[in-house]
Amino acid sequence: MTVIDTDKQFPPPLPEGGLRIIPLGGLGAIGRNMTVFEYAGKLLVVDCGVLFPDVEQPGVDLILPDFGPILDRLNDVQAIVLTHGHEDHIGAVPYLLAHKPDIPLVGSQFTLALVEAKLAERRIEPYALTVREGGRERLGPFECEFFAVNHSIPDALAVAIRTPAGLVLHTGDFKMDQLPLDGRITDLAGFARLGGEGVDLLLSDSTNAEIPGFVTPEREIGPVLDSIFAKATGRIIVASFASHVHRVQQVLDSAGEHGRKVAFIGRSMVRNMGIARDLGLLRIPPGLVIALDEATTLPPERIVLMSTGSQGEPMSALGRMASGDHRHITIAPGDTVVLASSLVPGNETAVYRVINRLSRGGATVIHKDVAKVHVSGHAPAGELLYLLNVTRPSNLMPVHGEWRHLRAHARLGVESGVAPDRVVICEDGDVVDLVEGRASVVGRLGSRYVYVDGLAVGDVGESLLTERRILGDGGFISATVVVDSVTGKVVGGPTVSAKGFSDDPDAFNPVIPLITEALGRAALDGIADPHQLQQIVRRTVGRWVNDAYRRRPMIVPTVVEV
């Protein structure tokens, strides 16, 4: 098994006739999925998604893949192939097209509709090529064939990429639900045909590689929702991903059966369900869905609110309801709230905070830990083994997962018969070459997190995030002192103030004489340089704070010369 080498060098030139694969996101964390394929000087991008920040990235809105390795080669990009419409696969498209808006987008009808809605907000009109399962498109030197896969969003596709270097299958996100609500199963027959042809490299979804067995059918959620609706005596609020059309369909069906009207809440929910309805992916009986304004006039027992916010996002519709900040909806006793989604890693604290706030407001909260209101959209180990046995790849590159998922998937590959030295575990920015049927890591281009903070893209770095974490954890202390520019002696102050540290206005009285004493010693030693004096103030305050409070705030010393 090829493992991570921390001393990787810059990659050599791609050998003639070889295929280069560069993952720019999606490895080591679930999100920012983006993979670049290179053949004969041309590039093909598969997916271009975002990662959502966690508590270690305060103030950050989104995290993008690092486009740096391809920014000076955008003219070589033949297309961006999008496997499906989840944000971790399409969310970064507007940021990449901001550099070159005419890069063709290739995807299914629903996927492209979601992307085009995002691009319209930025006044970008893309060149879009709609494909279907069973279709083939030649994109420069890349011959792409598309296969239906079942996932937690309609119209998901896998893509087989053929070049003279070999056949590569990229599954995208998938599972093997044998009874999907839309009747669209993962194309195992097509994958078996590829296996007969000879899959030289398989890139496959690793999210649930640690989980044994097979996925629970989506159909099992319907009866659970029916039971919840039958028992609820007041208003029902269901929170789900804004792209989970199948779950919304189940909610609509249950609402109709129990004589309730449905209102969509949240901008992305309203937009996406409108797109799904227009494309015939969402069946809405006449009169079932109403506007939120009308819903607020009906008795609670006659309405269902279909909302965003299943991941505890504070500014989502459900998040604002939980905190009492929603303009139209106030949580009240008798409400039943259903969180019909999985927990995305890193969101646990936020989700349980929302659950507790809803419970405090009097709502009964039902989530996946207490009822089967959600099933995963990703293949567990049994289905991954099935895929491996059907496709029989010569080389395996696990993608889409944290390190534990990638390694679990790698073990499955070896168990299924892939040679250990043909299983390639990579990290973002690695360079993998497929040459003469063998895939191997040949170097590293590097890849960093690109943070979106408001309108700023890439301006926030790790050092700034460290400062924000220090501010959040320890607060801020400012120490100002005036010194003689010649002797360095204190002639004014010190004054010490703080934010987020203590409410006691006299808390810093003990440190003031310590600063004066330290600067006095410095003056006797002939130290008058303001920068050196600032460091003395910083160290003095820091030692005192550590001794007195065992805290590490941000300390900003200011030395003024007169």
Where are these regions (language model features)?
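A glycine- and charged-residue-rich anion-binding loop/surface
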Residues: I4, L27, L51-V55, D76-V77, ...
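His/Asp/Glu-rich metal-coordinating catalytic cores
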Residues: T2-V81, H86-L298, S316-T330, T349-R353
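Short Gly/Ser/Thr- and Asp/Glu-enriched loop/turn motifs at secondary-structure junctions
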Residues: R132, E427, R551-I555
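Structured loops at beta-to-helix junctions and adjacent beta-edge loops in soluble globular domains
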Residues: L24, A40, R162, D205-T207, ...
